[in-house]
Swiss-Prot record:
Primary subcellular site in the record, as a coarse category: plastid
Protein encoded by which gene: hup
One cellular component (GO) term of this entry: chloroplast
Protein name: DNA-binding protein HU homolog
One of the protein's GO biological processes: chromosome condensation
Length: 93
């Protein structure tokens, strides 16, 4: 399912317009990204948590040439699945 399909499905179930739903989803995603970018964690109980994690500097390797490279420390966004989400997926499996 892509974003437009999600918008259509939510609009169908809630009877709100697709335009309103798109604004809400776009705003929600922007807020999550901006919040995680500042170092804060965003938790949606039962669904999961978004946060940025520190990645230490390390030595890497160019897969094409085999040359060793230095990879500097960085922050990467992560998502941890909530219990309700995990259990729902496992039940339908």
């Amino acid at each position: 399912m892509n974003k437009s399909q999600l918008i259509s499905k939510i609009a169908y179930y809630t009877k709100y317009s697709k335009t309103d739903i798109e604004k809400i989803i776009t705003s929600m995603l922007e807020i999550i990204v901006d919040t995680v970018a500042t170092g804060e964690k965003v938790t949606l109980v039962g669904f999961g948590s978004f946060e940025a994690r520190e990645r230490k500097a390390r030595e890497g390797r160019n897969p094409r040439t085999g040359e060793k490279l230095f990879l500097p420390a960085s922050r990467i966004p992560t998502f941890s699945v909530g219990n309700f989400f995990r259990n729902k997926v496992n039940k339908t499996f």
